[in-house]
UniProtKB/Swiss-Prot annotation:
Predominant location: cytoplasm
Pathway field: Amino-acid biosynthesis; L-methionine biosynthesis via de novo pathway; L-homocysteine from L-cystathionine: step 1/1
Chemical reaction(s) catalysed: L,L-cystathionine + H2O = L-homocysteine + pyruvate + NH4(+); an S-substituted L-cysteine + H2O = a thiol + pyruvate + NH4(+)
Subcellular location: Cytoplasm
Annotated keywords: Amino-acid biosynthesis, Cytoplasm, Lyase, Methionine biosynthesis
Enzyme nomenclature, EC number: 4.4.1.13
GO cellular component, one term: cytoplasm
GO molecular function terms listed in the Swiss-Prot or TrEMBL record: cysteine-S-conjugate beta-lyase activity
UniProt record, GO biological process: methionine biosynthetic process
Source species of the chain: Papiliotrema laurentii
Cofactors demanded by this protein: pyridoxal 5'-phosphate
Membership in a protein family: Belongs to the trans-sulfuration enzymes family.
UniProt name for this protein: Cystathionine beta lyase
Lineage: Eukaryota, Fungi, Dikarya, Basidiomycota, Agaricomycotina
Length: 17
């Protein structure tokens, strides 16, 4: 998870952290 929230479509992070 990104601490700042990632774009899950691109980064694979959940976008909610």
């Amino acid at each position: 998870h990104d601490v700042y929230g990632g774009d899950y479509r691109i980064t694979g992070d959940d976008g909610h952290s």
